[in-house]
Design a protein with these regions (language model features):
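Binding-site signature for planar aromatic cofactors or substrates
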Residues: 1-188
Length: 188
């Protein structure tokens, strides 16, 4: 086992330290998990990528949420706030970092939307920002995570959003994102 792996195994903290923040900044993909309160509800796990996440403080991160075919994360946060974000190393030393906490949906109607928008490259199709206040930060070994080579970002969603334009995107959200697959309120 290399020394970098020894130093990161099994940490539990209330917030991110600078080493974790730097490591998160180098990751090309992260995963977001949420669930409804209902026992029969569907758990959701979504991959995210690109330059879409910022660490705002040792226990607050935010990511861009784009128009898409689903609205599960937003609906679950609105119902119960629970959210987990996971990062894992696909290159270099193995590591997994999970951020557990309460999520908040910041839509264009929210007072913080414009300020958060300034933190990111502007792209068509931004539906909201998802802000997570973490109350538990864990790292684990990641020894079972395979190596993958990063090839590049996909531009399909961005091109689709640009082609649709703002009005058609809002119509799409009203048609496809009004509620989750379990019937929870989504886009308003």
């Amino acid at each position: 086992m290399d020394s970098a792996a020894k130093d990161i195994m099994g940490k539990i903290a209330a917030e991110l330290d600078q080493e974790m923040v730097d490591w998160i900044g180098r990751q090309k993909i992260f995963f977001v998990a949420s669930a409804p309160l209902a026992e029969s509800g569907h758990i959701n796990l979504s991959p995210k990528g690109g330059d879409t996440l910022r660490v705002l403080s040792p226990n607050v991160v935010v990511y861009q949420d784009f128009t898409g075919s689903g609205i599960e994360t937003m609906a679950h946060i609105r119902e119960n706030g629970r959210l987990v974000i996971m990062f894992c190393a696909f290159e270099g030393a193995p590591q997994i970092i999970r951020l557990y906490g309460q999520g908040e949906v910041v839509t264009p109607k929210h007072k913080d939307f414009a300020d958060l928008a300034q933190l990111f490259p502007q792209k068509a199709g931004v539906r909201s920002y998802i802000r997570l206040k973490a109350d538990r930060v864990t790292s684990s070994c990641g020894f079972g995570v395979p190596f993958y080579s990063y090839v590049g970002e996909r531009d399909v969603l961005d091109k689709w959003c640009v082609q649709k334009g703002p009005e058609a995107l809002e119509e799409y959200r009203q048609m496809k994102n009004r509620q989750s697959i379990d019937g929870l309120p989504g886009w308003e």
